Amino acid sequence: LKPDEELQGPGGVLSRGYFVFRPRN
């Protein structure tokens, strides 16, 4: 897992090692 790469997870996005929850509307 690279911190520079944005990984799309279930209900959130992994960016720079931080999991930010982004609700799908």
Curated annotation (Swiss-Prot):
Subcellular location: Secreted
Modification Asparagine amide occurs at: 25
GO molecular function, one term: hormone activity
Keyword Secreted found: yes
Keywords: Amidation, Hormone, Secreted
A Gene Ontology cellular-component term: extracellular region
PROSITE patterns per UniProt: NMU
UniProt-listed GO biological process terms: regulation of smooth muscle contraction
Key word DNA repair present: no
Family recorded in the similarity comment: Belongs to the NmU family.
Annotated function: Stimulates uterine smooth muscle contraction and causes selective vasoconstriction.
Protein name: Neuromedin-U-25
Naturally occurring in which organism (per UniProt): Rana temporaria (European common frog)
Organism lineage string: Eukaryota, Metazoa, Chordata, Craniata, Vertebrata
